[in-house]
């Protein structure tokens, strides 16, 4: 059993790691997992990338058992098909992320699957090792673990291999942490820190999930209005 702090898409918001640090200090989870998309905000400059990268490096060294995942923004920058407003920075810092943080596509702990967007369709036939060994170019698909949008794509399904699992995902901005059922599989969406034209959009909370029971706690810690 593990208690895991889930850090959703940060998109160059370094103070999300300040919040995560305070949560870890107070609630003592076994480890944290970051769900990808640390790069790219469409209103960003190189200085924003430098500040965010410095904060991530600090967090990595303070909490070395943190697990880091790929998001669609990192993967597409690495395969030279960036989805960003700052192509130079996204490619440079995606490479730094790959080299320094050893990101994975998927992490499974007991009966909980962590990925950027969810494991569906033919991807849900693969085990954890095979998923993590996929060529990054194979992920440029609408149903892939970095692109799937389970709230909108009604053609997604989950093979029997993972039907009894819970999935924790980021990727799709939500106003609140929410649960959905896709083909019998519970999906918990936690991307609630995204902004709309630089204005707060989601409830800005993180969860700690028990990977044995699947129960989770929303963590509500005020981290001041100066995050942006």
Residue ranges with predicted function:
Residues 41-43, 75-79, 115, 121-124, ...:
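Short catalytic/ligand-binding loop motif for oxyanion handling, primarily in non-cytosolic enzymes
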Residues 150-220:
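Conserved beta-sheet core of the metallophosphoesterase superfamily
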Residues 88-94, 104, 108-163:
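Active-site-proximal loop/helix segment associated with metal-binding centers of metalloenzymes
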Residues 6-8, 32-37, 67-72, 114-115, ...:
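Active-site neighborhood of phospho(di)ester-bond hydrolases with catalytic His/Asp-centered motifs
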Residues 1-5, 106-114, 183-186:
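Beta-strand-turn-beta hairpins that frame and shape the catalytic cleft
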Residues 7, 12-88, 92:
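Core catalytic region of metal-dependent phosphoesterases/phosphodiesterases
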């Amino acid at each position: 059993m593990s208690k895991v702090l889930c850090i959703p898409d940060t998109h160059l918001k370094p103070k999300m790691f300040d919040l995560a640090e305070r949560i870890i200090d107070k609630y003592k989870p076994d480890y944290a997992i970051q769900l990808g998309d640390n790069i790219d905000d469409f209103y960003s400059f190189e200085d924003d990338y430098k500040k965010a990268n410095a904060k991530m490096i600090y967090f990595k060294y303070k909490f070395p058992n943190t697990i880091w995942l790929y998001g669609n923004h990192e993967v597409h920058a690495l395969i030279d098909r960036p989805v960003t407003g700052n192509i130079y920075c996204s490619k440079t810092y995606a490479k730094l992320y790959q080299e320094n943080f050893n990101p994975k596509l998927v992490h499974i702990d007991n009966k909980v699957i962590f990925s950027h967007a969810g494991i569906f369709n033919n991807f849900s036939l693969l085990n954890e090792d095979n998923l993590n060994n996929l060529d990054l170019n194979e992920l440029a698909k609408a149903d892939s673990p970095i692109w799937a949008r389970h709230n909108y794509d009604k053609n997604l399904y989950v093979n029997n291999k993972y039907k009894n699992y819970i999935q924790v995902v980021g990727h799709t901005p939500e106003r609140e942490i929410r649960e959905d059922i896709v083909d019998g599989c519970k999906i918990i969406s936690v991307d609630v820190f995204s902004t709309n034209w630089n204005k707060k959009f989601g409830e800005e909370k993180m969860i700690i999930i028990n990977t044995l029971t699947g129960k989770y706690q929303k963590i509500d810690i005020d981290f001041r209005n100066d995050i942006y």
